[in-house]
């Protein structure tokens, strides 16, 4: 095992896949000369050249469309959005083309494209850089949505996403790029649509994904001191959702808590849902 930052795991996954398959290329704002806004493509321009690591104009609709169109000629593009907030500029290409090409062509065309970048809140980047979009894309038929919580999952799931023949939304966090974790030395791929039990427990099931998994660990540590055993499930993939893993855990614990990123500091009491 070796220790990598989250951004390094992302870079390693893309680089390994691009060495394996020449039809894969990376495009987006500042991905080449600047090594990516969050340095997730560091060194890739030097290794693969400007034909496969492509700096784009600030025109998300345009380069999202180029990526989707290029899948129809046998390419497998990776598109980096500087933030998924900017994906809204190109959302017509994602929703009305990428997600529907296979069906609209009667199966004649696949659309193996990965749209990746940070989502949700970040450090002092204001409202237009801070919205979470996983639920938006997860409600669109034809898309797969992955939100990893650590470097190990990020690398294994990104490699799977790149090899997938359908469009994948791969969401990261600006607050996690420096997080470190152990990653195997050799190649590995994690299956899309399979949740992971990060911590076994017996009293309550805690379900979350992405950066909020770290908060789940903190809560579980506090509850453990009170004699309450938490089972933490990391969804990893929001669509397709691994509901079976969650149900099996709830059958054991009979209690379920779902953690999401909301404005807890402005609430008199925590959010609850009865029934």
Indicate residue ranges for each PLM-predicted region.
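Glycine-/acidic-rich phosphate or pyrophosphate-binding loops and their flanking alpha/beta elements
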Residues: 9-13, 155-167, 178-222, 226, ...
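Short helix-loop-beta junction
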Residues: 44-50, 215-233
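Glycine-rich phosphate-binding loop
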Residues: 253-263
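Conserved small/polar residues in nucleotide/adenosyl-binding loops
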Residues: 265-271
């Amino acid at each position: 095992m070796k220790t990598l930052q989250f951004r390094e795991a992302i870079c390693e996954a893309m680089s390994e896949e691009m060495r394996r398959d020449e039809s894969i290329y990376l495009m987006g704002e500042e991905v080449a000369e600047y090594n990516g806004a969050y340095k997730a493509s560091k060194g890739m321009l030097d290794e693969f050249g400007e034909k496969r690591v492509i700096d784009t104009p600030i025109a998300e609709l345009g380069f999202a469309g180029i990526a989707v169109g290029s899948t129809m000629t046998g390419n497998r593009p990776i598109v980096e959005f500087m933030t998924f907030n900017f994906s809204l500029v190109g959302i017509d290409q994602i929703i009305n083309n990428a997600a529907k090409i296979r069906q609209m062509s009667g199966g004649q065309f696949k659309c193996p494209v990965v749209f990746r970048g940070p989502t949700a809140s970040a450090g002092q980047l204001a409202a237009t850089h801070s919205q979470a979009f996983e639920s938006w894309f997860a409600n669109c038929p034809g898309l797969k949505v992955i939100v990893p919580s650590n470097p190990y999952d990020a690398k294994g799931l990104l490699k799977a996403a790149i090899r997938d023949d359908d469009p994948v939304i791969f969401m990261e966090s600006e607050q996690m790029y420096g997080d470190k974790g152990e990653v195997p030395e050799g190649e590995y791929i994690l299956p899309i649509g399979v949740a992971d039990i990060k911590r076994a427990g017996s009293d309550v099931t805690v379900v979350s994904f992405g950066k909020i998994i770290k908060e789940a660990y903190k809560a579980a540590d506090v509850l453990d001191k009170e004699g309450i055993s938490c089972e933490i499930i990391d969804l990893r993939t929001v669509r397709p959702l691994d509901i079976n893993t969650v149900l099996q855990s709830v059958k054991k614990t009979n209690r379920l808590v779902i953690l999401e990123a909301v404005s807890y500091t402005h609430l008199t009491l925590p959010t609850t849902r009865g029934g």
